[in-house]
Amino acid sequence: TGQSKWGEKITRKDHFYKARVVEDTYDWGEYVQPSREPKDLIIYEMHVRGFTRHESSGVEHKGTFEGIREKIPYLVELGVNAVELMPIFEFDEMEDVREYEGRKLLNYWGYNPVCFFAPNTSYASALEFNREGNELRNLVRELHRNGIEVILDVVFNHTAEGNEMGPTFCFKGIDNNIYYMLTPDGQCY
């Protein structure tokens, strides 16, 4: 988790972020957030990586927040007025690697989040500290400017920390009994 290159395992000798403090100086500019009745929404559900990773997408920044931003005219042309982004939060794609027909299969979907508060680093188009946060903000701002609402698919019912034997990434360390249902003795989740 926290890897800037998709599908490359971080080794002990590699340096990676364990925590970050982000100064929020992003300029949202002037725009109005769209607000439609749910019955009027035309929703396009998409996966950040999957929507633009193929060459046929025609975007420069394939499989990233920036790649989706490049496709906004296409979404407008379709008549879409809301996008639902499948999990965009930090997760470990190397969590359960498997082989199939000689190819490495990764945790593609992101349904085992590590942190609900951090966009997935590998969805940024450039390997630059905190780029993913600004690229996500740019995407949301431009979707809104084009009249497209943003819905986030957030997974609250399980995380990459697993059960009581799993690793501690953040939720257990922040406040275990707030983030997890515990047994009456407070030991298991």
Predicted regions: what they are:
Residues T1-E45, R53-S57:
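The feature marks proteins involved in alpha-glucan
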Residues D24, I42, I72, N177-I178:
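Intrinsically disordered, low-complexity segments enriched in small/polar residues
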